[in-house]
């Protein structure tokens, strides 16, 4: 008539839990990081598409081999993005920056630049 667990049984359970946590924790952490990366990429695509719509609807022009930017704040103000702000899932901070618009090979190309300092290198589309 035993009434409890022996020390060896308790240690065995602790070892099993430790082994499982060593296996499970990195897997869960990697899954979370991957989900954040995927969400970030989706946010970037949404911003680029909104920048493209803003550019097209505003009838702005970019000449061959010219580069101009439209700021995320301008896109938000003109309601091409439905949220009042877009949050970066990696940093939990608001996504700012701009969409860089290039015209070459007879086609427009759009790229999201996350830092305002990178945007200042280019002319604003409104100028």
Language model: regions and residue ranges:
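Extracellular/periplasmic head regions of type IV pilus-like filament subunits
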Residues: 59-106
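N-terminal alpha-helical signal peptides/signal-anchor transmembrane segments
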Residues: 43-59
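N-terminal single-pass transmembrane signal-anchor helix
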Residues: 2-28
């Amino acid at each position: 008539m035993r009434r409890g667990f022996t020390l060896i049984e308790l240690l065995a359970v602790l070892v099993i839990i430790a082994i499982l946590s060593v296996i499970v924790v990195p897997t869960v952490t990697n899954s979370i990081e991957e989900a954040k990366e995927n969400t970030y990429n989706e946010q970037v695509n949404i911003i680029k598409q909104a920048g493209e719509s803003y550019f097209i609807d505003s009838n702005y022009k970019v000449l061959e081999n010219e580069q101009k930017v439209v700021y995320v704040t301008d896109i938000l103000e003109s309601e091409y993005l439905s949220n009042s702000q877009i949050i970066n899932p990696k940093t939990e901070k608001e996504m700012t920056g701009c969409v860089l618009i290039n015209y070459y090979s007879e086609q427009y190309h759009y790229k999201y630049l996350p830092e305002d300092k990178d945007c200042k290198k280019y002319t604003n589309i409104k100028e």
